[in-house]
Amino acid sequence: LLLLTVYQILFMDKVPTSAAVDEAVKIAKRRDGQATANFINAVLRNFMRSEHRNEEPKDWETKYSMPKLLLDKMVRQFGGKRTGEILESLEKPSHVSLRKIDPTVEIAGTRASLLTESALIADSGNFAMTEEFQSGKITIQDETSQLVAPQLDLEGAEEVLDACAAPGGKSTHMAQYLTSGHITALDLYDHKLDLINQNAERQHVEDKITTQKADATMIFEEFGSDKFDRILVDAPCSGIGLIRRKPDIRYRKESSDFVDLQKIQLEILNSASKSLKKSGIIVYSTCTIFDE
């Protein structure tokens, strides 16, 4: 309780300090009685008077709540200056990114993306509840994720494999480029295949996407050689690039994870490449900032 309240005082500004202390005292009294409440109150009041409370943390691990494992990797790969910039950027709130399925759609409170014509940006909002989302005129998809489908240079008639497809954002985006072509979307788990199907139906591209339960490291064994004109390998990775939206990711990583993921990624690429036609294109994408 003390740690949580001190963190709230130091790093969160929506609740006044006096209110944070008062709430902590009430919780302590309710849980452990008046003596504990008096102790909590004394410690927090003393901390508020302390000359140290307004000091900037001297290390990145404390200031940005970033584990040493990830900090060391960042510094090795990017250097100190760039690492500081990355850490600062991760503290900023993430915006909402939409993909236009209907190119004529206009959504109040959004602005055009500078990265891609397909994206609209908003500072906040629950767009999944809008009529435009429900009717399949827009979907929620990160800007950078929307850069992937154009890289496959789809002309309309291709046989496409999305090797690691869930939840289906890139599959449905690729489907927008197809006329007579077709996408086979793979995942290991039934509930994730259901997500792909739901997204495809909402966006009215279910006739262009077939989901299949399969291990992406066994693509060649499943489909044989020279099967696909285009293959997307949106490989499983550490997901460090998603920290702003999923801050808990940073606390669930061990050094062995990066080595294990590299092996899986290579197995997927090796197997997928054997099922690619000789004139085909394979695109490899991840949502991490690290080399691994």
Positions of PLM-derived features:
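S-adenosylmethionine
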Residues: 1-292
